[in-house]
Amino acid sequence: MSQQLLEELGRRQYRTDIPEFRVGDTVRVGVKVVEGNRERVQDFEGVVIRRRGEGINENFTVRRIASHGIGVERTFLLHAPRIDSIKVIRQGKVRRAKLYYLRGRAGKAARIRERR
């Protein structure tokens, strides 16, 4: 009984405005940020290095290189209300499900071919 209840509650939280994207794609995620009494949308753009989970618990990790060559990774719940938008900037062609090897690479070595 409780499993059915959890699934029903989860179905209400599902988002329908999520574009189709895969590991290796470059995406721009708009995240709602609360500062004091106002709320704004902050964009986080990078390469999807991982997708995992299913249903309401599905999440993905985006990696980007910030200033001075520091790598920054953020993990987002796919159906989270804090996510304002997800836009696919470019589609990458990769042969792995998890791109953890990008953590050890920088510059041209971290490039991903574009999917046609």
From Swiss-Prot:
The keyword Zinc does not apply. GO terms for biological process: translation. SUPFAM superfamilies: Translation proteins SH3-like domain (SSF50104). Pfam families: Ribosomal_L19. The keyword Ribosomal protein applies. Belongs to the bacterial ribosomal protein bL19 family. This is Large ribosomal subunit protein bL19. It comes from Chloroflexus aurantiacus (strain ATCC 29366 / DSM 635 / J-10-fl).
